[in-house]
Amino acid sequence: ITCLPYRRQRLVLFAALSHPLAQKSQLSLKQLEGQEFVLREQGSTTRRVFEHALKQADVRIRVSLEMGSREAVREAVAQGLGLGIVADTAYVADPRLRAIGLTGPELYTHAHIICLKERKNARLLAHFLSLADTMKDPG
């Protein structure tokens, strides 16, 4: 298997417009102390990265719901059931929601392109990998 780094995805906090924190443009992790969250299921990369950062900052949140998809998290947050967190590439603008920047530690997940090593040079796949290389994050 070949694994090629593709993109860093910054985590984004989001809230229903009716949530008191929705009026903020930026928050620190410390400001999330005691807040209710709707999170993805245990094992989710986004959740793992977020919970690790919370632990490092000694911040405790309350998990009101665990959902199996980003879409379910978005709908629960829109209904006012808690705050949500997703990768910026997965955040879908919604008039019921407000994205809020997080200050402090860099909270990222990483996307990779994975393929079978023996197929890496197949014409179609090689073309795709070349195109993806022009679109990946620098560095």
PLM feature spans:
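Short beta-strand-centered segments that line the small-molecule binding cleft or hinge
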Residues: 1-15, 73, 78-81, 97-100
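Short secondary-structure boundary segments
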Residues: 17, 87-90, 111
